[in-house]
From Swiss-Prot:
One of the primary rRNA binding proteins, this protein initially binds near the 5'-end of the 23S rRNA. It is important during the early stages of 50S assembly. It makes multiple contacts with different domains of the 23S rRNA in the assembled 50S subunit and ribosome. Forms part of the polypeptide exit tunnel. GO terms for biological process: translation. It comes from Shewanella pealeana (strain ATCC 700345 / ANG-SQ1). The gene is rplD. This is Large ribosomal subunit protein uL4. Keywords: Ribonucleoprotein, Ribosomal protein, RNA-binding, rRNA-binding. It comes from the Bacteria. The lineage of its organism: Bacteria, Pseudomonadati, Pseudomonadota, Gammaproteobacteria, Alteromonadales. Belongs to the universal ribosomal protein uL4 family. Part of the 50S ribosomal subunit.
Length: 201
């Protein structure tokens, strides 16, 4: 299959296995959920009554004081006591096989092509790290909500895009399922398309 280059009167031959496969919604959902889960820190921690610092001594005698009976100062009903069901550090990560991850990315790219959300250009960049210059270039192409994918990190482009709302710049190694579906359009250079094909096999 072919992808038409927007800035040139030509087309790029690409693999149908990468850019023309059926959309597997269940797989994409599983991979996106796993990606989000793997980003969670899960480092919260509270102490149970067994872990709280304090004496194990009975605070006062059982009878005769007129106060409610108490056996410990570390109980959950005491100020500074332990938490009944204390939250502990958790690992929320979900395992995703390489084959599944690549399959999800192929599904997403194929769906982007079908929905005319994937824009392929011969090259894309700015001469200086100027937001104004990049904004003008994107306005010319009628792009606002866009992810720009380049073969390697372009520092000028990255710095120019940093202050633009709903514009992000990634190299091929930095793309992920969440960022690909989060933007309305995905702008990719021809060289980046070749690298994506190699990466996804």
């Amino acid at each position: 299959m072919e992808l038409v280059l927007k800035d040139a009167q030509s087309a790029l031959e690409v693999s149908e296995a990468t850019f023309g496969r059926d959309f597997n919604e269940a797989l994409v959902h599983q991979v996106v959920v796993a990606y989000a889960a793997n980003a969670r820190q899960g480092t919260r921690a509270q102490k149970t009554r067994a872990e709280v610092t304090g004496s194990g001594k009975k605070p006062w005698r059982q009878k005769g004081t007129g106060r409610a009976r108490a056996g410990t100062v570390k109980g959950p009903i005491w100020r500074g006591g332990g938490v009944t069901f204390a939250a502990k550090t958790q690992d929320h990560s979900q395992k995703v096989n390489k084959k599944m991850y690549r399959g999800a990315l192929k599904s997403i790219f194929s769906e982007l092509v079908r929905q005319d959300r994937l824009i392929v250009v011969e090259s894309f960049g700015v001469e200086a790290p100027k937001t104004k210059e990049l904004k003008a270039k994107l306005n010319e192409m009628q792009l606002e909500d866009v992810l720009i994918v380049t073969p390697e990190v372009d520092e000028n482009l990255f710095l120019a895009a940093r202050n633009l709302y709903k514009v992000d710049v990634r190299d091929v190694a930095g793309i992920d399922p969440v960022s690909l579906i989060a933007f309305n359009k995905v702008l990719v250079t021809a060289e980046a398309i070749k690298q994506i094909e190699e990466m996804l096999g």
